[in-house]
Amino acid sequence: MKYVKARVFITLKNGVLDPQGKAIGHALNGLGFASVGAVRQGKVIDLELAETDRTKAEKEVKAMCEKLLANTVIEKYEIELK
């Protein structure tokens, strides 16, 4: 069976405070990486779907994001199909 692979990038929406990103930036500066300015942190989810129709696969992944993978109140997501 053929599969469609999907990668979902989930990040905080602009304007939402990112304490983890701030902590990472502070730690990098403390390690001597002085050129690092603002840091935003997110997550990447890789999925393999038993689907041959890319349009159906994208629609299904979007539904997954809306229902579970992303908190759409504070997060945005981007889907990349392979």
Give the label of every model feature segment.
Residues 1-82:
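Long, contiguous binding/interaction regions
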